[in-house]
Amino acid sequence: MKRNPSSPLPLEGIRILELGMVYVLPLAIAPLAAMGADVVKIESEVRPEQTRWGPQPNNQQHEPAYNYGGSFHMLNRNKRGVTIDLSKPKGRDLFLRLVAVSDVVAENFTPRVLRNLGLTYDRLAEVNPRIILLSSTGFGQTGPWQNYRAYGPVTEAVDGLMELTGYADSPPQRGGSGGLGVTFPDVAGAYYGTFAILAALEQRERTGRGKWLDLSHYEAGVATIPEAVLDYTMNGHVQGRMANRHPWRAPQGAFPCSGPDRWIAVSVATDEQFVALASVLGMPELANDDRFATLRARHGCQDALDEFIAKATREWTAEELERTLQAAGVDAAVVANSRDVWMDPQLAHRGFFEMVPPPASAPDVGPRPFARPGWKISEASGATRLPAPDFGQHTREVLAEYLGLNGGELDAFVDDLAAEGVIADKPRKGMVARDPTDLPGMLEAGLLQEVDPDYRKRLNDHLAGRNAPLANW
């Protein structure tokens, strides 16, 4: 594909072959697709993308289930989908032909997989010396842990983050079970991968040769806790859990406001900010109390101080207190739930959410709002160009473009690959959609705050006038 120097999308013309499963690698490649790269997501009938099966829209099962998974649609917009079975010789040959005319290959298999397939970086570089290979794994391509299985909760534990998450008198907590709400090392690892690819593309402009990028989620996770690591290397301190508090700011925490489960986060860095906080909350005398007058004193009396603050914040709505404290120069923000985020006026002003049309196989779902990348490029709309692909939707199209085939030659080539089981238009039988989520059970367990029966109307009303209406909802 020829690059268009006048395109507002900086990666237009860059071809990326994504052998990505689940979350981290698809997330790493998503920003590159948004920046214009032609991303071809490769699956096979025996190894379809796991996120295809759920969660299903409106917590209802749809057919074909493998084209309806919400996570799949979030992570794979702006990508084209093909199927190639790499376990078959013809599949590997076909893959190498695509590598020969591509810029980047990204994969997140365990290290032994590509070795066993004979698709190492050295082999890819033989057919294309300019190819860049990103290998995204839990623990890297070398070392005693190289073939360990690693999902986010595993790396979250081993990289030290879990030990730092939670309350001092409670066991360690992982992000997805009461800490961060997401598996943070997954996100960090993903964007390290994005950055590495961009850096390798830039270097290739100078050297003319590709690179092998060996990404370890473990190492990316350790890099997210630099203060704790540095505290040990410099002082011998092994940090523990401090809940919402801070090593030197005080007060800091989440305080209750009026309304069910409404909270405000406050973080005070200076004595001047504390004077302002005490004044806004109607307790100016606290600033003259010897227990709270200085930062050092406040740090030693946080339990008592938190009680005073919590009693006062209950008289405010979170939104009004946020505005008032910010105007007074105090760091404060509403503790937003997912509905608050969708309804946020700042994000609405920025056009952060956009309506994305449904894939061809799922018209009954209708357009859905999705988050755009967290950046804007001048002269580029940032709008989604393609919905996430149906299974094998673009196989024929990509083979024609990348290999220069057409007409009868293309027909014969595709027919032969299909007959050999190299390509397919649906996953192998036996793979089914996830069961609908047990909403009552999740509510009872506290994993959901509530189920909003009017969520579609709320979103429709909020986005009306900014984006296309939510047709077919």
Predicted regions and their residues:
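Conserved Rossmann-fold dehydrogenase catalytic segment
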Residues: Q141, P171-T183, E205-G221, R241-P247, ...
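N-terminal helix-loop segment corresponding to the beta1-alpha1 unit
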Residues: M1-R206, D390, E397-W473
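A glycine-rich dinucleotide-binding beta-alpha-beta segment and adjacent secondary-structure elements
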Residues: A328-R385, D438-P440
